[in-house]
Swiss-Prot record, chain B:
The chain crosses the membrane at residues 13-35. Coiled coil: none annotated. It is a single-pass type II membrane protein. PANTHER family: MICROSOMAL SIGNAL PEPTIDASE 23 KD SUBUNIT SPC22/23, SIGNAL PEPTIDASE COMPLEX SUBUNIT 3. The gene is SPC3. The keyword Endoplasmic reticulum applies. This is Signal peptidase complex subunit 3. It comes from the Eukaryota. It comes from Kluyveromyces lactis (strain ATCC 8585 / CBS 2359 / DSM 70799 / NBRC 1267 / NRRL Y-1140 / WM37) (Yeast).
Length: 91, 189
C-alpha cells in the first residue's frame, strides 16, 4: 500500500492558482461551444454520426489543452513563507 | 482544478451534461420536423380485403370439438409511402396492420389484433405497393365468432428514433368490412 500512496503523490501534477482559474473558464466556454457546434453540424448534414464526431473531437482537444501540467501553467508559483523557525540575528 | 484528477473530473462531468443537451436538442428538433412534415395524417390505402374462415377445434384457438372457434386468414392489398417518417433521427420504422372490433358479448370492449407487420430500415425502401398478400397472423377471438361483425382495418406506424421517445401514429386510410361467414358444415353438428 505504501507503493500506491507514493504513486498517488507522484500523479498529482499541480498547476498554479492563475492557471487553475484559466483552465476552468476556458474548458467551460469550450464545452458550451462544442455542444452548440456539434448540434448545428449534425442538423445541417442531417447525420447523427457527424454530431457525435464533432463532439468527441472537441472533447479530446479540450482534454489536451486542460489536463497536462504544461510549464506555462506553473510560471506563477507563490513563494510561501518558510515554515521552520526563523533565526533573528542580534544587532 | 489543482490536480490532474480534478481537471479530468471537471471536464468529463460537464461534457456528460452537454451531451445530454445535444441529445435533447436532436430529439426535440426531429419531433418538430415530423410535425412540420404532417406525418400524423399520412395517407394509406388498404383495399381488397378478403378472408377465408375455418372452424378450429384445437385448444390453442380456444376451440373444442363441441364448440369450435372461427379462425380467419386475411388477404389484402396495401399501398403506402412512409418515406416522410424518415429524418436524421429515425433508426427504423415498424409498420403494422390491425383489425379493430367491439366485443359481441361485451359491446363496450374494443379489441385490436395485429394481422401483418413489417420493419422498414431505410428511407429508400419505404414505399410499398403490395397486392394480394397474406396476413402473417390469423384472426380469431375469445368469443367463438369473428365473422359478421364490422372489423376496422388500419395501418399503424411506430418510429424507433436514435434518441428520444418512441413515436406512434396511424394512417388515415382505414377500411371497415364484415368478414364472410364460413362455408363449413361442422358448425351445424
Amino acid at each position: 500500500m505504501e507503493v500506491l500512496q507514493d504513486l498517488g503523490r507522484q500523479l498529482v501534477f499541480p498547476i498554479d492558482f492563475e492557471s487553475q482559474s484559466y483552465t476552468e473558464s476556458i474548458s467551460n466556454k469550450a464545452l458550451y461551444l462544442i455542444t452548440f457546434f456539434s448540434f448545428i453540424s449534425g442538423y445541417l448534414t442531417e447525420s447523427i454520426k457527424v454530431s457525435g464526431i464533432v463532439f468527441v473531437l472537441g472533447l479530446i482537444v479540450v482534454l489536451v489543452i486542460v489536463l497536462p501540467p504544461y510549464s506555462a501553467y506553473n510560471k506563477h508559483r507563490p513563494q510561501w513563507a518558510n515554515s521552520g523557525p526563523t533565526v533573528v540575528e542580534p544587532k | 482544478m489543482f490536480s490532474l484528477n480534478q481537471r479530468f473530473q471537471h471536464v468529463s462531468s460537464l461534457a456528460l451534461s452537454c451531451s445530454f443537451l445535444v441529445i435533447a436538442l436532436i430529439a426535440a428538433t426531429s419531433w418538430l420536423q415530423l410535425v412540420k412534415d404532417n406525418v400524423f395524417e399520412l395517407e394509406s390505402q388498404l383495399s381488397h380485403i378478403r378472408s377465408a374462415t375455418r372452424f378450429a377445434k384445437q385448444k390453442r384457438y380456444g376451440g373444442s370439438a363441441v364448440n369450435p372457434t372461427e379462425v380467419s386468414k386475411i388477404r389484402f392489398n396495401a399501398d403506402f409511402d412512409f418515406s416522410r417518417l424518415f429524418n436524421w433521427n429515425t433508426k427504423q420504422v415498424f409498420a403494422y396492420v390491425t383489425a379493430e372490433y367491439e366485443g359481441d358479448e361485451n359491446p363496450h370492449t374494443m379489441n385490436e389484433i395485429t394481422i401483418w407487420d413489417k420493419i422498414i430500415p431505410s428511407r429508400d425502401n419505404a414505399t410499398f405497393t403490395l397486392s394480394d398478400i397474406d396476413a402473417k397472423y390469423q384472426l380469431w377471438d375469445l368469443e367463438s365468432k369473428i365473422t359478421e361483425r364490422p372489423l376496422t382495418f388500419k395501418l399503424h406506424w411506430n418510429i424507433q428514433p436514435w434518441f428520444g421517445f418512441l413515436i406512434n401514429g396511424e394512417t388515415t386510410g382505414s377500411k371497415t368490412i364484415e368478414l364472410k361467414k364460413p362455408v363449413d358444415k361442422q358448425k351445424g353438428k
